[in-house]
């Protein structure tokens, strides 16, 4: 059995299914490039047949990412598989991941197919996919609740047809570590051709055991691929956290005896990027990437760490990408210094025009606050990345008036399809007034389901990062805006969310694996 653990990242596919986490093509490309710097083995870039937007995003990622295998999900039918293969064609290395449900409940209620029909369709799907690539992954949806005899029959059949990775998902997060490991081991032992495939796990965190289940399946069940997401992003309670399984295997190599190719110094930058793009703030006590992950409040612990770090730290903060929150630039810093710092932070901008736009925003910010931190620079880049030629709404300016005892009044100027619009509104507070001002011109009909504010750095000069979540006609999107002025950040976030609602290239089919 191999001593290499394959890391399969599905942030861009399964992670995006978290309500409000939908991303634009440009945002997906930025995350894919960071995943490449992280050196994940496989990037599941999306589900090509779900929408034109997902197809184009996968194709764009396949064109720019060269060092990771690019994967697309596909249902077990020729149309989906051909669509996936077409999207993946530009990739240096690609995988088709096809699936069909195998539990009695899913076959009867959802697919309305007999077991024999499912068996045949699974085999034919893998056979068809082999026309395009030798790298085929098969998942029996709801596999952990499937009849063991039937599950083994299906998996033996798809391996015979050429499936090279078999992924056994815990679709509803019901499994427990020992039982899940037993399932993987039992299936492998019962299938005569099991040695011809890599065995993979895909766990959901509904009972808080996704990481534990994945690691148990690796150590006790013989799995050699873990499907995971940055920050554990995903629908319901999320997926297996990439950062946690990677650091568990790295830190406890004495126990797992496995090698992982991930560049762990890129973990925190990846976490911050996904958080900034999706608007999903990482909880402070989150393992590895939380703000308090390496903080010690106890006097005894602090004393121990000062004397010898390994008294209370089992891994080093710098090994996962945490750096000191130092001042890097100021208002007198030039364009070359700014560009150099972007490179040090692992930020790649596509053109000099993008560098110039980001530098212009940096100079504006430097006039407002004396100390510019790395987090400020990352926020600037994220803000600028939201702007593209197809942008429907774009913030220009804001003025507001608020006196004690009077309802606040706001005036917002913004572009809508290239035309400048000015809206005015009143509300219970300055933010409420600002959003009413925007709606006076937009009339979106959207419902706000979340509004949150986060300080990017410490101090009263810190930029505010606002996340707005809107819902309309069954679609839920997030918008993120940053500015030293919280009200302006709110306007930017609201317009960013409206842009995503306006974008028709949104995933329509969201399968659970």
Swiss-Prot record:
Broad class of the protein's primary localization: cytoplasm
Keywords carried by this UniProt record: Amino-acid biosynthesis, Branched-chain amino acid biosynthesis, Cytoplasm, Leucine biosynthesis, Manganese, Metal-binding, Transferase
Keyword Ion transport part of the UniProt annotation: no
Annotated organism of origin: Cupriavidus pinatubonensis (strain JMP 134 / LMG 1197)
Native organism taxonomy: Bacteria, Pseudomonadati, Pseudomonadota, Betaproteobacteria, Burkholderiales
Protein name stated in the entry: 2-isopropylmalate synthase
Name of encoding gene: leuA
Keyword field contains rRNA-binding: no
Residues that, per the record, bind Mn(2+): 14, 202, 204, 239
InterPro entries, alphabetized: 2-IPM_HCS-like, 2-isopropylmalate_synth_dimer, AIPM/Hcit_synth_CS, Aldolase_TIM, LeuA/HCS_post-cat, LeuA_allosteric_dom_sf, LeuA_bact_synth, PYR_CT
Gene3D superfamilies, A to Z: 1.10.238.260, 3.30.160.270, Aldolase class I
Annotated segments matching region Regulatory domain: 394-513
Family the UniProt entry places it in: Belongs to the alpha-IPM synthase/homocitrate synthase family. LeuA type 1 subfamily.
Intracellular or extracellular location(s): Cytoplasm
